[in-house]
């Protein structure tokens, strides 16, 4: 195999859900469809790399910061949905089931992987709540063990503030990923969300 082709296969194999075999098939398809697929795709990737930036407010990706969601006057600024990854935000937006604002953490707390609060967009939640008119925080974090630890950290961070903290309702299986849920399940989980019972001493 040509070394340049081999390097491209290796680069694709680093992407989520793409192993060596699927990466090879993808590269072959691109090379065999250079004019129709490969060159337009390369142009789009280059354009996105030049234009897309991270929103300084919520962590979304857009061509401007603050992003189009944060600056949309039609969004409900009293609601803040906290999600792990950008894909979770897109899942809510795709279903058109939520009209509030978002806060993308960029992952979840993981002692094994060395990911602590400083590695995530966590402490900025406190600043957003204290400096805005947010009335409810919806914790939409994947129901994994690490997700539960992250959710508890957020609750401890905000429990003394005058803000409602809720979570998605049952329906999302333990270990499930919000990004992979169908629109109906996600809608029910959101509309039937439950408020956390805080024991403040």
From Swiss-Prot:
Gene Ontology molecular function: DNA binding; zinc ion binding
InterPro entries named in the record: DNA_Rcmb_RecR, Rcmb_RecR, Rcmb_RecR_Znf, TOPRIM_dom, TOPRIM_RecR
CDD domains, sorted: TOPRIM_recR (cd01025)
SMART domains tied to this protein: TOPRIM
Any single Pfam family the record assigns to this protein: RecR_C
Keyword field contains DNA repair: yes
Domain Toprim: residue ranges: 78-173
Keyword annotations of the record: DNA damage, DNA recombination, DNA repair, Metal-binding, Zinc, Zinc-finger
UniProt keyword annotation of Transcription present: no
ZnF (C4-type) intervals: 55-70
An example Gene Ontology biological process: DNA repair
Family affiliation: Belongs to the RecR family.
NCBIfam families associated with the record: recR (TIGR00615)
Function: May play a role in DNA repair. It seems to be involved in an RecBC-independent recombinational process of DNA repair. It may act with RecF and RecO.
PANTHER family per the UniProt record, alphabetical: RECOMBINATION PROTEIN RECR
Name the UniProt record assigns to this protein: Recombination protein RecR
Organism: Wolbachia pipientis wMel
Taxonomic lineage from the root: Bacteria, Pseudomonadati, Pseudomonadota, Alphaproteobacteria, Rickettsiales
């Amino acid at each position: 195999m040509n070394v340049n082709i081999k390097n491209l296969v290796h680069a694709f194999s680093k992407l989520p859900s793409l192993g060596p075999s699927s990466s090879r098939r993808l590269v072959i398809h691109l090379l065999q469809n250079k004019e129709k697929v490969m060159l337009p795709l390369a142009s789009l990737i280059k354009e996105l790399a030049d234009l897309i930036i991270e929103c300084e407010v919520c962590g979304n990706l857009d061509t401007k910061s603050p992003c189009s969601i944060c600056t949309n006057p039609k969004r409900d600024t009293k609601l803040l949905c906290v999600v792990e990854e950008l894909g979770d935000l897109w899942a809510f937006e795709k279903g058109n089931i939520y009209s509030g604002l978002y806060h993308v953490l960029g992952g979840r707390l993981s002692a094994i992987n060395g990911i602590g609060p400083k590695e995530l967009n966590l402490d900025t939640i406190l600043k957003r709540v204290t400096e805005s008119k947010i009335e409810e925080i919806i914790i939409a974090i994947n129901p994994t063990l690490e997700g539960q630890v992250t959710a508890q950290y957020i609750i401890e961070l905000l429990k003394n503030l005058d803000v409602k903290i809720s979570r998605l309702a049952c329906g999302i299986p333990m270990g499930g990923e919000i990004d992979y849920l169908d629109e109906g399940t996600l809608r029910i989980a959101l509309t039937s969300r439950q408020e956390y019972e805080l024991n403040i001493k």
